[in-house]
Design a protein with these regions (language model features):
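Glycine-rich, histidine-containing beta strand-loop boundary motifs that form or position
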Residues: 14, 26, 51, 64, ...
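Short proline/glycine-enriched turn/loop motifs at strand-loop junctions of beta-rich domains
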Residues: 15-22, 55
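Substrate-binding/active-site clefts of carbohydrate-active enzymes
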Residues: 103-116, 125-235
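Short beta-strand elements bearing conserved aromatic residues within extracellular beta-rich modules
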Residues: 22-24, 60
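Solvent-exposed serine/threonine-rich low-complexity stretches and specific carbohydrate-binding patches
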Residues: 34-42
Length: 235
């Protein structure tokens, strides 16, 4: 989201060098690719558009028309938020609303000599590390179900465990948006969107913020080489 000449709205840009036409489509224009056609920036392969009055929470995709005439609907590879699977659209979001509280951690990190300071890293996949109990057996024991904890809920549980075990950092298996649970995040669709399986971008910010306040560093796995073949993705 941004403001141009006093008008609030959303600026979109995407690189699609082989496209004949690119449009932004969503509920706001009845998913009609003829309405919000993007402007090509010279020979750069980049298409752009500013859509006035569009607000946070708007669901959208890019409609791309190729040289063979066939259109394709693609999620925004630069989006910060996506619909919860099995839905595949991107969501307009504003990342500036969260108020961070980890100033003490950031000062400590800046003063730390990372080459010599001790480090003990706990690698974890959030979706399989712990899930919500959904049933109780005849002995009164909780049976783990398939529902994930959200980022805020698991932050509390993970921080407590990691501190008790003496780790200094957690390393998260990929939390970027991905279509398939079983891939553990290693088939990425949205590199700039924390997966909506566990909540909103603000929820993820809270997760990092909470661990920082508990004195725990957060490392993210980065997977730039695995592209799923889902129709709404890059490949």
């Amino acid at each position: 989201p941004m403001t141009v000449k006093g008008v609030s709205g959303v600026y979109f840009a995407v690189w699609a060098p082989e496209a004949m036409r690119v449009s932004v489509v969503g509920d706001f224009n009845l998913w009609d690719g003829r309405r919000s056609q993007m402007r090509r920036l010279g020979d750069s392969g980049v298409f752009e558009i500013f859509i006035p009055e569009l607000k946070k929470g708007a669901v959208y995709k890019y409609e791309i028309k190729f040289k063979n005439g066939d259109p394709a609907l693609k999620a925004d590879p630069y989006a910060n938020y996506a619909e919860l699977r099995p839905n595949t659209a991107s969501i307009v979001w504003d990342l500036d609303e969260y108020k961070w509280n980890d100033q003490d951690w950031m000062k400590k990190r800046a003063a730390l000599d990372t080459k010599t300071a001790p480090m003990s890293i706990y690698e974890v996949h959030l979706g399989s590390w712990m899930r919500k109990p959904t049933e109780v057996d005849k002995r009164g024991r909780e049976i783990v179900g398939s529902e994930f904890y959200n980022y805020r809920e698991i932050a509390v549980k993970l921080a407590e465990y990691v501190k008790e075990m003496g780790y200094t950092h957690v390393e998260l298996l990929p939390v970027m948006e991905h279509p398939l649970d079983a891939s553990w995040g290693y088939q990425v669709i949205g590199y700039y969107a924390p997966t909506s399986r566990y909540g909103t971008p603000e929820d993820f910010m809270y997760f990092v913020d909470y661990l920082h306040q508990a004195g725990i560093g957060v490392i993210l796995d980065w997977v730039p080489a695995h592209f799923p073949k889902d129709a709404h993705g890059l490949a």
